[in-house]
A protein has these predicted regions:
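Non-catalytic terminal/accessory segments
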Residues: 1-603
Length: 603
C-alpha cells in the first residue's frame, strides 16, 4: 500500500495538467495509512472532546475503529451522522450556526480534505487567502497593501449567508469537472446532505456546507475559485493603458527644470550659477508636491482584487461609474453561475480616502505631501497614494468590553475608559490569571501588529489590560492595587512565581511593547502547511501498534484515552501522573484499564 506522501504528491503532480480527470479516488480511502495521518493531524484539537450527535468523542480511539470505518467505506454503507448544531457569537452581536460533526465523520472528512487539497491547491488563484497552506488574514492584508496602491475606489464584497447558501448541485458539477469518480462524488454529497440536530430535532440540509465541518473550507474555496477566475479574466479586459499620462503640473515643472539645466551648462559666472541652482531646488520642491501621473486619466484603468473565504474587496483605479459597474457585473455572475446573492446594502462602493473595512482592519489610501529624499537624493513624497491598514478605536473598545475588562463612564459628554476587575478569574490561581491576560494581549497584538497605527492605537489597550489585571488580583486577595504592585512588582516588572520540577520559576506580565511589525508571508497561517506527518517512535499510531498498555504493561489491542486539557488533571491517579509527566493529552491503554479510568477504579 502506497504511503500517504506518495499518494498526495502523485495527485498534486497530475493536477498540474488542467485537462486531467481524476478517477479511482475513492480507493484512497481504503488506505489505513491515510487515516493514521488524518488522526495525527486533528487529534490535538480541543473540540474533539466535544460529543457529536452520536454521543462519542475522540476518546477510545483504536486501530480497530479505523478498520471498521474503512470497511463501511468499502461496501458504501458508511453514512455521515447529522452534526450537532451550536451557535457562536458574531462581531455584530448576532450568532453564527456551527456544526459539530462526530469524530468518525471528522476523521473521514480530513482524509477527503487532504485529497481535495492535493488536487485543487495548485490551481487556486494567488488572490485567494482563506484556509490555504501558508496563507492567512495577514497575507491577504499584505497583498492589499502592496497591490492596491493608487486605487481611487473600493468595492467591499458581501455575499449573503454564503456558507448556508452554497448550491449543492452547482458544487457537485464543479467537482465533476476534475473528478470522474462516482463513489467519491457520492461521498461528498453524503456529507452535504447529512443534516443537523438542534434541540433534539433533525433538520435536512438542502444547501450550504456545515460550518464546523473539516471539508467546508476547501469546498468553499473550490466553489469561489470560479469567482476568482472570473475576476482574473474580467481584470484583463478592464485594465487599460500601460502607464498614466504625465500630469500638467509635472510636465510644467519638468520643462522648467530642463530650461535651467541647459542654462547651467553654458553659464560660467558663479553668482548666476548659484542663483540657477537655487531656482532648480525650488522647482524640485514644487514638483514633489504634485503626483507624477494624471490622477483622472481616462485612458488608464486598473483593477485589483483579494478574497479571504467569503469576504472580498476590489480596488479600482478609474471612475466611480467603473466601480459601480464592477459591483453589478460581480453580482450578476454570482447569481447566474453560482446561485449566490450579493448584498446590495452591504456591498459598498467607497472612495479610498474614506474607510473600507476588511478582516477587522480599516483600509484607506493615504494622500500626503510629506517629502523625503530617495537613494539618488531626489525629493519624493512619503505617501503618494499608498494603502494604510489601521485598527480603529471602536475595535479596541469592543474587544476590551467583550473581555469584561473595560468600564465606560461619561464625564462632561466625553466617554471615559476605566479598567475593570475580571471577576470570572478571581478564583483562579495567580499563574492562570497572568497567563489569561498575556494570551489575550499577545493574541490581539499579533493580529493587529501590521496596522500602520498599531503602536498608537494600542496605548489605551495596554493600559486597560494592565490595570484590569491589577484589579483582578486585588479582587482575589481583597486588597488595594497598590498592595498588589508592591507584592508582585520587581525591577519594574510584574512577576508571578510558580513551582516546577526544576524549582521556582518566574513568569512576567507582557511588556514587549506594541511596535508595528513588518508584514511578511511567513505570518501565522490559518491551516497547516501541506506536508505529511512522518510518524516517529512516539507517534499516536506507533503507540497503538505497540500493543503494550502504557499503564499495566499488558499485551493486547489498545485504545487511546484523551483528555481535554492537561492542566485539568490533578495528578491524584496513576494515569494522570503518567500523562502529566510525559506532557501528553493521550495515553494508550488496554480496554480493561480504559474502563477502570472512566469508572474511577484505577489503582
Amino acid at each position: 500500500m502506497r504511503s500517504p506522501e506518495r499518494v498526495l504528491n502523485s495527485l498534486s503532480e497530475h493536477s498540474k495538467d488542467a485537462s486531467y480527470k481524476f478517477e479511482r479516488l475513492y480507493r484512497i480511502l481504503f488506505n489505513e495509512e491515510m487515516f493514521y495521518v488524518a488522526y495525527q493531524r486533528i487529534y490535538a484539537k480541543e473540540g474533539n472532546m466535544t460529543k457529536g450527535s452520536d454521543g462519542q468523542t475522540i476518546d477510545n480511539m483504536s486501530l480497530k475503529r479505523i478498520d471498521k470505518l474503512i470497511d463501511t467505506l468499502k461496501d458504501e454503507t458508511y453514512q455521515p451522522q447529522p452534526s450537532k448544531r451550536v451557535y457562536i457569537p458574531k462581531k455584530n452581536g448576532k450568532k453564527r450556526p456551527l456544526g459539530v460533526p462526530t469524530f468518525n465523520d471528522k476523521l473521514i472528512q480530513e482524509v477527503v480534505r487532504m485529497v481535495l487539497e492535493a488536487i485543487y491547491e495548485g490551481s487556486f488563484e494567488y488572490t485567494s487567502h482563506g484556509f490555504r497552506p501558508n496563507r492567512s488574514c495577514h497575507t491577504a492584508l499584505t497583498h492589499i497593501q502592496k497591490e492596491f496602491s493608487g486605487a481611487k475606489w473600493f468595492v467591499e464584497g458581501d455575499i449573503k449567508g454564503f456558507f448556508d447558501n452554497i448550491n449543492h448541485d452547482v458544487l457537485i458539477n464543479i467537482l465533476m469537472e476534475r473528478i470522474a469518480d462516482e463513489r467519491f462524488i457520492r461521498l461528498v454529497r453524503k456529507f452535504l446532505k447529512a443534516g443537523y440536530i438542534e434541540e433534539w430535532q433533525f433538520h435536512n440540509t438542502y444547501s450550504g456546507t456545515p460550518q464546523g465541518g473539516i471539508i467546508s473550507p476547501i469546498l468553499a474555496n473550490i466553489y469561489l475559485d470560479k469567482l476568482d477566475k472570473y475576476i482574473k479574466e474580467y481584470t484583463t479586459k478592464f485594465d487599460k493603458g500601460k502607464k498614466r499620462k504625465f500630469s500638467r503640473e509635472s510636465m510644467d515643472f519638468g520643462n522648467a527644470r530642463k530650461r535651467i539645466v541647459r542654462r547651467l551648462k553654458s553659464v560660467k559666472d558663479e553668482r548666476q550659477r548659484t542663483k540657477l541652482i537655487l531656482e532648480l531646488k525650488a522647482i524640485e520642491q514644487g514638483r514633489a508636491k504634485y503626483p507624477n501621473g494624471e490622477e483622472m486619466d481616462a485612458d488608464y484603468r486598473r483593477m485589483k482584487y483579494a478574497r479571504y473565504a467569503d469576504d472580498f474587496i476590489v480596488g479600482v483605479i478609474g471612475s466611480k461609474q467603473d466601480a459601480k459597474q464592477i459591483k453589478e457585473d460581480i453580482k450578476n455572475f454570482l447569481a447566474d453561475k453560482l446561485a449566490l446573492e450579493l448584498s446590495d446594502e452591504k456591498t459598498l462602493v467607497t472612495h479610498t480616502e474614506r474607510v473600507a473595512k476588511f478582516l477587522g482592519y480599516e483600509i484607506t489610501v493615504r494622500k500626503s505631501n510629506d517629502q523625503r529624499r530617495d537613494k539618488r537624493g531626489r525629493l519624493r513624497r512619503t505617501y503618494g497614494k499608498r494603502v494604510c491598514l489601521n485598527v480603529s478605536t471602536e475595535t479596541v473598545r469592543k474587544k476590551l468590553f467583550d473581555w469584561g475588562v473595560l468600564e465606560l463612564t461619561n464625564r462632561n459628554g466625553k466617554e471615559i475608559w476605566k479598567p475593570k476587575c475580571k471577576s470570572g478569574l478571581i478564583f483562579n490561581d495567580d499563574l492562570e490569571i497572568l497567563d489569561s491576560y498575556n494570551r489575550e494581549i499577545v493574541g490581539f497584538y499579533n493580529y493587529y501588529s501590521i496596522a500602520n497605527n498599531c503602536a498608537h492605537a494600542l496605548n489605551n489597550f495596554s493600559y486597560i489590560m494592565e490595570y484590569s489585571m491589577y484589579k483582578t488580583f486585588a479582587g482575589k486577595y481583597k486588597c488595594r492595587t497598590r498592595k498588589i504592585n508592591k507584592k508582585y512588582r520587581k525591577n519594574g516588572k510584574f512577576i508571578v512565581k510558580h513551582m516546577t520540577k526544576a524549582g521556582v520559576k518566574e513568569r512576567y506580565f507582557y511588556d514587549g511593547g506594541f511596535k508595528r511589525k513588518k508584514p511578511t508571508y511567513k505570518s501565522e497561517c490559518d491551516t497547516m502547511p501541506r506536508t505529511i506527518y512522518t510518524a516517529g517512535r512516539t507517534s499516536l499510531i506507533e503507540r497503538l501498534k505497540a500493543r503494550e498498555c502504557e499503564l499495566c504493561g499488558a499485551t493486547d489491542d489498545l485504545v487511546m484515552h484523551h483528555v481535554r486539557k492537561l492542566k485539568n488533571l490533578q495528578g491524584k491517579e496513576s494515569w494522570e501522573r503518567h500523562m502529566i509527566a510525559r506532557k501528553r493529552k493521550t495515553i494508550a491503554v488496554c480496554r480493561s484499564c480504559h474502563k477502570k479510568i472512566h469508572d474511577g477504579k484505577i489503582d
